């Protein structure tokens, strides 16, 4: 018990971070990179993540519970609707919603739809994350950032590659 008390200081922070985006936006890959090893399944096949998945990251001054969600998309069947519902519910009662946009694919109507869902979230910080920057030129990554920036109001923005 004493160890826990000394661990939980005023400087210690903790919270829930939900990752959302279109299928194959890099949500599971980002979780694996932050955790430091493969804990989430990754695949080029859309809808590999079918259930919300939580990964706990603990550092000296913080603990973050990252919530991986199914890719959000225009549903064509009941499964698609259920996956979207799961992702939308994962944005409830969290501290941060990270909206991931793939730098290698043009921002489109799917991203616009996901951004609308993120805009509906109240009480959470919203972070725009441009992923897969290693697959495009710096100029393209900046263009993607600008296009995605127009989809909402963001508390923070980051362009990254989870691979390196």
Protein language model annotation of sequence segments:
Residues 96, 125-127:
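Structural signature of beta-strand start/N-cap positions in the alpha/beta core
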Residues 25-29, 109-110, 136-139:
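P-loop/Walker A NTP-binding module and the surrounding RecA-like catalytic core of P-loop NTPases
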Residues 46-48, 70-73, 103-107, 133-136, ...:
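Conserved nucleotide-binding/hydrolysis micro-motifs of P-loop NTPases
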Residues 108-120:
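Amphipathic helical hotspot of TIR/SEFIR-family domains
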């Amino acid at each position: 018990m004493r160890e826990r008390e000394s661990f939980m200081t005023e400087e210690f922070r903790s919270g829930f971070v939900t990752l959302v985006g279109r299928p194959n936006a890099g949500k599971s890959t980002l979780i694996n990179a932050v955790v430091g090893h493969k804990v989430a399944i990754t695949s080029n096949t859309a809808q590999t993540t079918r259930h919300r998945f939580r990964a706990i990251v603990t550092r000296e001054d913080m603990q973050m519970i990252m919530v991986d969600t199914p890719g959000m998309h225009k549903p064509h069947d009941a499964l698609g609707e259920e996956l979207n519902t799961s992702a939308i519910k994962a944005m409830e009662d969290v501290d941060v919603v990270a909206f991931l946009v793939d730098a290698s694919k043009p921002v489109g109507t799917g991203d616009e739809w996901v951004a609308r869902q993120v805009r509906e979230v109240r009480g959470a910080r919203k972070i725009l994350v441009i992923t897969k920057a290693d697959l495009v030129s710096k100029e393209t990554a900046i263009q993607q950032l600008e296009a995605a920036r127009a989809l909402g109001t963001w508390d923070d923005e980051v362009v990254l590659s989870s691979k390196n």
